[in-house]
């Protein structure tokens, strides 16, 4: 795997474990470069011959806090830039679901928007109990078309998922674990030990039994993705062109209530 090709991720090996870390700004917000790299990342991880398990985590104070607001402004001012990422948005989700190697999400901090989607598409999610997780697409005027509307209902049911997706509320890691959205929420000083424990248990089993069990479990998710992702991305693309989308981003930047018109 050519680590040097990546600017928004860092990599570290621990035996047969490859630790892959978001490494952007202070909250690892997704910009154009990171989005491009995400579309390639999981394919490259699949072909890395020196790893059997991936740990995905974040540097700085967040796991991945969703979209970068400067990038949002670019997409609002030139909707062609949003349309241009539609194909890669689907590749990110399919890349995760097609990755045969088990992948553990180590939530060291906030996972929001696309960051939450990526975490929830991982096989095991272990969070610092101080972390927050949620999908606030609606709070910035967007449909959760990047996979959020696909994976949340599968994990916690449609009623809870739609409430959280339509309010954009964030959950504490403890609450997320309680409702089954993630696997574990642990104290900060126990996070690495818990990740190592689960990784060790997985790696203690025959490689191909583990990989193909994961692939079998992912069949239904892949069928759902194929049947819904085109519409989900199309709805998100349309929402980027609304007046309320522009207002929502401006209000967030200016730390004021939104003045929504329904347009």
Predicted region positions:
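Conserved CoA-thioester-binding segment of acyl-CoA-metabolizing enzymes
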Residues: 1-59, 94
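Terminal low-complexity tails and localization/encapsulation signals of metabolic enzymes
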Residues: 1-6, 250-263
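Glycine- (often His-adjacent) and acidic-residue-rich active-site loop
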Residues: 3, 58-95, 111, 141, ...
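Crotonase-fold acyl-CoA enzyme core
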Residues: 94-210, 233, 237, 241-242, ...
